[in-house]
């Protein structure tokens, strides 16, 4: 049986890594070893940050809701508790959108929460 040299396979493997590293800074898109290391790190960052993104958006929504709630004389926790007592099920994403784009609608929800808290 003839000896098989791995040139084609090796070139394909290196080319695949360098293609993934396209646009990276400095030697990280030219040299195979540094490109491979950076691609591995990039996969790690992407995996980690897909999870982090959910936390970051929730924090942003809570911050926006809290700011709008305080303009209506409530804290964030009081608003959420009042909405729960009033059987108003609006998620944080929608509440934050209302707080930014529809102040009157948010005020109506805040007033409903205030009424339930007063009772």
Curated annotation (Swiss-Prot):
Q: Which Gene3D superfamilies has this protein been placed in?
A: 6.10.160.10, Ribosomal protein L20 (1.10.1900.20)
Keyword list (alphabetical) reads:
Ribonucleoprotein, Ribosomal protein, RNA-binding, rRNA-binding
A Pfam family that the UniProt record links to this protein:
Ribosomal_L20
Protein origin, superkingdom: Bacteria
User: Does Cell membrane count among this protein's keywords?
Assistant: no
Under the heading InterPro entries, the entry gives: Ribosomal_bL20 (IPR005813), RIBOSOMAL_L20_CS (IPR049946), Ribosomal_protein_bL20_C (IPR035566)
Any one GO CC term of this protein is:
ribosome
CDD domains in alphabetical order: Ribosomal_L20
Q: Which GO terms describe its molecular function?
A: rRNA binding; structural constituent of ribosome
As for family, the record states:
Belongs to the bacterial ribosomal protein bL20 family.
Biological role stated in the UniProt entry: Binds directly to 23S ribosomal RNA and is necessary for the in vitro assembly process of the 50S ribosomal subunit. It is not involved in the protein synthesizing functions of that subunit.
Put simply, this protein is called: Large ribosomal subunit protein bL20
| Underlying gene | rplT
């Amino acid at each position: 049986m003839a000896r098989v040299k791995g040139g084609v396979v090796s070139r394909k493997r290196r080319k695949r890594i360098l293609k993934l590293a396209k646009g990276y800074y400095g030697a990280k898109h030219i040299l195979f070893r540094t490109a491979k290391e950076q691609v591995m790190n990039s996969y790690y960052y992407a995996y980690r940050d897909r999870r982090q993104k959910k936390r970051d958006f929730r924090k942003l929504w809570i911050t926006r809701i809290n700011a709008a709630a305080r303009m209506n004389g409530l804290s964030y926790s009081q608003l959420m508790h009042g909405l729960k007592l009033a059987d108003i099920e609006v998620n944080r994403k929608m509440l934050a959108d209302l707080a930014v784009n529809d102040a009157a609608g948010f005020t109506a929800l805040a007033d409903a929460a205030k009424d339930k808290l007063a009772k």
